[in-house]
Amino acid sequence: MSRIVAIDYGRKRTGIAVSDTLQLIANGLTTVPTHELLNFIGGYVAKEPVERIIIGLPKQMNNEASENMKNIEPFVRSLKKRFPELPVEYVDERFTSVLAHRTMLEAGLKKKDRQNKALVDEISATIILQTYLESKRF
């Protein structure tokens, strides 16, 4: 089977997670500067079989799109143009940063490590992907 890639898109940094080949478990991959994201994905897709890409959908509590959506939409258009064979799906990303911080706290990370924004983005992408994978099982 192929992998699924999840993206927690940010203006400066973007967290990336990937599934295992059985598409059961999400693993954090890395965080990349957003301006390098398309090239990073291109390199990854060239090395690994990828079935689809999941994008964290930023919504406000009232279910409206957040301010960051205006940055995500042009990126998704570029992504679909460069990789037309890869389906792109959105997953609600509300509370992923809160869950990422809670995960780091429960894992016993020191305060300095919990302040690492790149790690928060990577864990958020992992949560987005795991949410997607679990939704497909049931």
From Swiss-Prot:
GO molecular function, one term: nuclease activity
Pfam families named in the record: RuvX
Predominant location category: cytoplasm
GO CC terms, sorted: cytoplasm
CDD domains: YqgF
NCBIfam families in the cross-refs: RNAse_H_YqgF
Record family assignment: Belongs to the YqgF nuclease family.
SUPFAM superfamilies reported for this sequence: Ribonuclease H-like
Keyword presence, Hydrolase: yes
Electron transport in keyword set: no
Organism of origin: Bacteroides thetaiotaomicron (strain ATCC 29148 / DSM 2079 / JCM 5827 / CCUG 10774 / NCTC 10582 / VPI-5482 / E50)
Subcellular location: Cytoplasm
E.C. number(s) listed in UniProt: 3.1.-.-
PANTHER family: POLYNUCLEOTIDYL TRANSFERASE, RIBONUCLEASE H-LIKE SUPERFAMILY PROTEIN
Task performed by this protein: Could be a nuclease involved in processing of the 5'-end of pre-16S rRNA.
Uppermost EC category: hydrolase
GO BP field: rRNA 5'-end processing
Alphabetical keyword list: Cytoplasm, Hydrolase, Nuclease, Ribosome biogenesis
Protein name, entry field: Putative pre-16S rRNA nuclease
Family matches, as InterPro entries: RNaseH-like_sf, YqgF, YqgF/RNaseH-like_dom, YqgF/RNaseH-like_dom_sf
